[in-house]
Structure formats: C-alpha cells, structure tokens
Design a protein with these regions (language model features):
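Cytochrome P450 core scaffold surrounding the K-helix E-X-X-R motif
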Residues: 62, 99-106, 159-162
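A glycine-rich, hydrophobic loop/mini-helix early in the fold
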Residues: 45-86
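Residues within well-ordered beta-strands of beta-sheet-rich folds
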Residues: 89-93, 121, 140
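A motif-centric signal for short, conserved binding hotspots located
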Residues: 51-53, 111-130, 137
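Extreme N-terminus nucleophile/cap motif
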Residues: 1-55, 168-171, 181, 198-204
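Conserved SET/PR-domain catalytic core that frames the SAM/AdoMet-binding pocket
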Residues: 80-103
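Catalytic cores of histone-lysine modification enzymes
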Residues: 89, 101-116
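C-terminal accessory segment of soluble enzyme catalytic cores
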Residues: 1-7, 13, 68, 133, ...
C-alpha cells in the first residue's frame, strides 16, 4: 500500500497558484493523518489547498474511520467515495513515494518518475465543524503485482481528471490506466520511522 510519500521540492508555477499555503514546508515522510497539499478546480480555475490525508465526508460520525485510500476498482460504487468521484476530484503532487518489499524483512524503496513531480489521482471532501470547514483527501490506488500503488496521471489525464465536465465514462477509463515506468532505488531503513521527516529518509542502502 502507498502509505508514505514525499513533497520537498516544487516549481514556481505551483507555488504561485491561488490557495498555495503560506509557509508550505518540505516533507520527506508524509503519512496518513498528515496535512497534504492538493490541487483542484474551483470555478474552472486550478487552485491549491491543504487538507488532512484521510477522507471525512460531512456525514461521517467516527473520524477515526476516515480512509486514506480508495481502490480504483470499486470507488465509483462505494458510498464513501461515489459522490466525491463524480464531483470532487483532485491531485496530490509528490516528488516520489515509498514502497516496502520482501517476505521476511521488508526493505523500503523510493520510486520517482521522469519529471520532478508526480501527480496522484485523489478525491477531496469538506467537513463542517462549527464555524470551521476542514478539507480532507483520499489517494486513489490501483493494483501493481502483489502491491498497490497510487494512480499516476500524465498532464493530459490530469486536466481530464480535474475538469468538471469530463464524462463519467472517461473518468472510469482513467481508473484503468496502467502504472507508467518508474525509477526506483532501495533505501536504508531510516524512513521506517514515521517521525523522521528529513532528507535522511532518502539515504541509499
């Protein structure tokens, strides 16, 4: 499962988007429950926002059960994700993500793309609480051999995913796109500590 990723470097064009958080800090070890940067369309305009990684629909009573992931194969049918899939799609920018492999002793791997940023398909929700509205997201994952990985979108697919008028059939087709080729390297075990959020997370084995 894609339980950790990193966003420690971004472009100037991303940093100048409306809603980009003031003082956005670099992170090397983002886990479910953390605040994450995400991109969405608001009135047809691309905007940035910050939300909790763990989807909290307005009707959810037990916030401890907020899912961090949504399976691409079933999200269009599940009540937790169905409405957000149709109306509240977003992207999670990342420099890469971590993957643990092995039978007895799992080793962490760092996976990146050709460019400086990857974009994960995701869903967002707004949770009203008193006079505050809290935003949250769920990462969409797809099967990759015996693992699950984020659903990665290229530039054209990103536009289609965010557009409010994309037909449902096209959205469902995006859920089936294969994982593109990725670069990977095995890491030391420092990243295993979820409290470590520093460049040392990427220390090679």
């Amino acid at each position: 499962m894609s339980g950790r990723f990193a966003l420690f470097r971004w472009s100037q064009s991303l940093a100048t988007l409306p809603g980009f958080p003031v003082g956005q800090a670099p992170h090397w070890n983002i886990s479910p429950g953390n605040q994450v940067l995400f991109l969405r369309h608001v009135g047809g305009e691309l905007q940035a926002a910050s939300g909790r990684w763990g989807l909290t629909p307005p009707w959810l009573n037990d916030l401890s059960k907020s899912p961090a992931h949504a399976r691409a194969e079933t999200l269009s049918e599940q009540p937790m994700f169905r409405e957000a899939f149709r109306q509240r799609r977003c992207l999670l920018p990342a420099n890469g993500f971590y993957e643990w492999r092995g039978e007895l002793r799992k080793r962490p791997f760092w996976l990146t793309g050709e460019g400086s940023l990857l974009h994960f398909a995701a869903l967002w929700e707004a949770y009203p609480a008193g006079d505050q509205v809290y935003l949250s997201v769920a990462m969409i994952t797809q099967p990759a051999a015996h693992l699950r990985r984020p659903l990665l979108l290229d530039e054209a697919q990103q536009h289609a995913w965010l557009a409010e008028d994309t037909p449902l059939a096209q959205l469902q087709a995006l859920l089936l796109i294969p994982t593109p080729p990725l670069r990977e390297r095995v890491l030391a075990n420092l990243v295993n500590d979820p409290k470590l959020d520093a460049p040392e997370c990427l220390t090679p084995a």
